[in-house]
Amino acid sequence: MIGLSHYLIVSALIFSIGLMGVLRRRNLLMLFFATEVMLNAVNIAFAAISHYYNDLTGQMFAFFIIAIAASEVAVGLGILIVLYKRYGSLDLDDLASMKG
């Protein structure tokens, strides 16, 4: 039987993958994707804990995080498109050197 610990381990592994993506990548789009992976890992943990304790609070938090992530995608991709059109790159090192 798959217990709570299995879900939490999978959630921690997925969160670790997202964290490594945030720490290792220099491209803003990849940082954006890694952040979304981390948010989805938190959603898995909330849903698993909610199911384990027979409480819907964790699932409500997960739906709230999904709504926040959707608005983040809309705003974030708009900003990334503007940055790419203006500078021609989404690399953090290039953007740091192009002040103005």
Swiss-Prot record:
GO MF annotations in UniProt: NADH:ubiquinone reductase (non-electrogenic) activity; quinone binding
Subcellular location: Cell inner membrane
Signal peptide: none
This protein's UniProt keywords: Cell inner membrane, Cell membrane, Membrane, NAD, Quinone, Translocase, Transmembrane, Transmembrane helix, Transport, Ubiquinone
EC class (word): translocase
Swiss-Prot/TrEMBL catalytic activity: a quinone + NADH + 5 H(+)(in) = a quinol + NAD(+) + 4 H(+)(out)
Pfam families hit by this protein: Oxidored_q2
EC numbers: 7.1.1.-
TM spans (from-to): 2-22, 29-49, 63-83
Gene Ontology CC terms: NADH dehydrogenase complex; plasma membrane
GO biological process: ATP synthesis coupled electron transport
Function: NDH-1 shuttles electrons from NADH, via FMN and iron-sulfur (Fe-S) centers, to quinones in the respiratory chain. The immediate electron acceptor for the enzyme in this species is believed to be ubiquinone. Couples the redox reaction to proton translocation (for every two electrons transferred, four hydrogen ions are translocated across the cytoplasmic membrane), and thus conserves the redox energy in a proton gradient.
Family: Belongs to the complex I subunit 4L family.
Quaternary structure and partners: NDH-1 is composed of 14 different subunits. Subunits NuoA, H, J, K, L, M, N constitute the membrane sector of the complex.
Name of the protein this chain belongs to: NADH-quinone oxidoreductase subunit K
Source organism phylogeny: Bacteria, Pseudomonadati, Campylobacterota, Epsilonproteobacteria, Campylobacterales
